Amino acid sequence: MITTVQEINKWRNLCFIRMQSRKWYPVLKKTPLVADGRKIIKHADKVPHPGEIIHPFYQPTAIEQFTACATEYNPSLLDGKKIAPSLIKHPVSLKTILVDSKLKFDDIRGVNRWLMEFVARRQHQRNIVLTPASKSVRSFHVLHLSSTDIAKLRGLENVLSEIENTNDLQSRVESVNNELQNIFDRDSKQTRLFCEDILAYLIKNYGNSTENLILLINVTEMQLFSRLDQMKAMNIILYHILCKVEANENPPYSPTLVTALENLLAAINNRFFPGRCENSLHPIVIEQLLSYFIITGNLNESKNFLGHLIKKGILPEATIINRYLEAIDVHFDKSTKIFDIRSKFAFIADLAPIIENYGTIDLFKFLIPMCRHFDELCSLLNIIRKSNNAKQAVDSTLPIFIKKVLTFTKDPMINSGNLSTVFNIVSPIYGQNVPSEFVEKFILSFALQGNYTMMAHMIDTYKIKLSHKYQLQIIRALKNSERNHALKNTGAVGYNKEFKKYFIEKYLNCTEREALRP
């Protein structure tokens, strides 16, 4: 039995040597989530197995699947661009690495089988049902201490008071640990006192300062190797510790507190399990740890606990998911660089069932900038269209979708086609009566492409009133179009000089017409 500070420190050092390569959770050492540009290897040109793709919302449409199966030479999805985030095995080291893969096949053979498995996996994600964790914390609050038991703790309470102003943490820990030992020695084998009840009582009543909480966390770690021999007991203690952390401290947390708590977590992991022990943690404690790691900016641990909750069929609170997404954005500084987007996909891969069935407006807003191909954007828009809060979500995200559509290519005809696709997807949500504020945004986007036909069609169909201010916006957009696409599609139907002349004469006032004269 380990009872002294010297013994615990010796044991901890041995554990540290053993755990250097694995820490609290070893898997992430083998699967680095933050992408390393040096690991983008030629092997990524090979089409990955459907199970290696970690994209959480891309679903090829029936037309995309048909086109891929009907193309004899180099059939592809996402135009064969290297934008499918995947976890693949390095061909030499056999380590798992994060890469952007091409979904471009050598020939038509096996494409149908590949698509069937990929679609089946996406369907499985859609069918996952998640339910919120029970918020009953009664089992954590029921401490099995009678008034007689509490009276036996007077000596321990006195020790805590006496050492309050002592700066030497090690001596304070040893004093409390020795008094705990005295209590159990006096009470002999007939004791009704359990170590977890005593520690939970002390944390609840004396852990109101950071210093005391750090002290009690260290005492808990020492007791792991003597009287705390069940994970059920550790669930109770961790619950009270994490409640105090949240109540006592405003982020950022004290580095000393963070170190003490993470040392305790590592010791728990090593004491009861050779690898990962979250399977034995209560869902409420897992949510607490998830919140804690999000606040401390530990994205790897946050991802682990979030993924564990989802695999257990538990739906995390929307506020927790939002904080997790904010932490990702903070870490990557809302970057849209290729490396950063790939890494972001790794951190949200586990969110697929939530995106499919429980998506929130904040989640959808986070995902839109991550789309690197129009087909990804359509997949996301179709998920929103089928969601329970479709109208509210589209109201909040449609302007972002419209803006994003124009970032995939500079070709005005392709952009016009993509804008029309988005409009056709969202129109049924409004019963074909798309609000004029959104129609006006579509018109301005068509103006940026120099598409006079679609502008005229939408103005007439939705009876858009062309105020002086709005006409000036259209003119500015058309001028930008002429600068950006001066040599493109000038003779195409809907874009040529005849359509331009017709649009100017019918829809613009005399004063505005002159601004567009050659």
UniProtKB/Swiss-Prot annotation:
Cellular localisation: Mitochondrion
UniProt keyword annotation of DNA repair present: no
Molecular function as annotated in GO: translation regulator activity
Keyword entries, A-Z: Mitochondrion, Transit peptide, Translation regulation
GO cellular component terms attached to this protein's record: mitochondrion
Transit sequence range: 1-19
Superkingdom in the source lineage: Eukaryota
InterPro entries attached to this UniProt entry: Aep1 (IPR031467)
Function: Required for translation of the mitochondrial OLI1 transcript encoding subunit 9 of mitochondrial ATP synthase.
Assigned protein family: Belongs to the AEP1 family.
Protein name, per record: ATPase expression protein 1, mitochondrial
Organism listed in the record: Saccharomyces cerevisiae (strain RM11-1a)
Lineage start: Eukaryota, Fungi, Dikarya, Ascomycota, Saccharomycotina
Gene label: AEP1
